[in-house]
Design a protein with these regions (language model features):
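An acidic-aromatic substrate-binding cleft motif
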Residues: 94-191, 207, 211-216
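Surface-exposed binding patches on compact interaction domains or structured appendages
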Residues: 2-68
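Surface-exposed loop/turn motifs at beta-strand-loop junctions within extracellular Ig-like
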Residues: 72, 89-91
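A short beta-strand micro-motif common to beta-rich folds, especially ectodomain repeats
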Residues: 79-89
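Conserved, mostly hydrophobic/aromatic
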Residues: 3, 85, 148, 218
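Structured alpha-helical segments in the cores of large, soluble enzyme domains
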Residues: 198-208, 226
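Aromatic-lined carbohydrate-recognition surfaces of secreted/lumenal glycan-active proteins
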Residues: 215-226
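Short, surface-exposed loop/turn segments at beta-strand-coil junctions that are enriched for proline
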Residues: 71-78
Length: 226
């Protein structure tokens, strides 16, 4: 959904009701907004999709984009679901109402992530961008990791060292299909250089679990030139 204004508008709010079918079954949903960035020598582009903020503004002759994320459960009843999208102004007056529909099909996707990926994510960038301590950085890294995993994107660096007990749940998660054992560029916590003793421990632990062994990867040379 996109909103546009001929004049500057402030104090706007947008919301959406629950998606429901004729029998009252409900779909999980949330509103997201397009965040815009100015790219040098290119212009303004939409990039991230954070949750909708209250009391947003739209400048004259500009538009603001919104996305609606709808999620169905594995046993969701198939059929047509409807929700009411509402936009209100600074005085709480309704500016626009519109129905939004979502169709649920009679099949479900597997819990396992079908597409095998290994995306890099910089723990250092998270640390410096948020300006947090190392302990808080681990918490933030985990939140980023789980967010990507929810969207079926596999980050290669686990939130915990594979040698720790905390990593076991992630390595066993059917949505996770790759994880970094050594190498990469996120430091020791998320891969990094390993000595022979650590590699031996990693081998003994991971090789004892066939599922983990299939997911384990090494990335020792980034973009080799030869």
């Amino acid at each position: 959904a996109y909103l546009a204004a001929k004049a500057d508008r402030e104090g706007l709010n947008i919301s959406i009701s629950a998606f429901a079918d004729a029998d009252g079954n409900i779909l999980e949903s949330e509103m997201l907004r397009e965040e815009y960035y100015t790219v040098i020598d290119y212009g303004v582009v939409p990039e991230s999709l954070p949750p909708v903020a209250k009391n947003f503004k739209i400048s004259a002759d500009r538009q603001q984009g919104f996305f609606i994320r709808v999620t169905s459960a594995e046993n969701q009843k198939p059929g047509l679901y409807r929700a009411l999208l509402s936009v209100t102004d600074a005085d709480g007056k309704t500016v626009k109402n519109a129905y939004v529909y979502a169709k649920v099909w009679d099949f479900s996707l597997p819990v396992e992530t079908s597409c095998k990926t290994a995306f890099g994510m910089s723990a250092y960038t998270i640390y410096t961008t948020h300006g947090v301590t190392s302990d808080e950085n681990r918490e933030l890294y985990t939140k980023y990791y789980e967010y990507f995993l929810k969207n079926r994107i596999n980050i290669w660096g686990l939130p915990f060292d594979p040698l720790t007990d905390e990593a076991d749940a992630f390595m066993s998660d059917p949505r996770v299909n790759t994880f970094l054992v050594a190498g990469g560029y996120n430091g020791h916590m998320y891969g990094g250089n390993r000595n022979s003793s650590e590699l031996k421990e990693l081998y003994e632990k991971i090789s004892a679990n066939e599922d983990w062994a299939k997911k384990a990867i090494f990335y020792m040379n980034d973009e080799p030139m030869d």
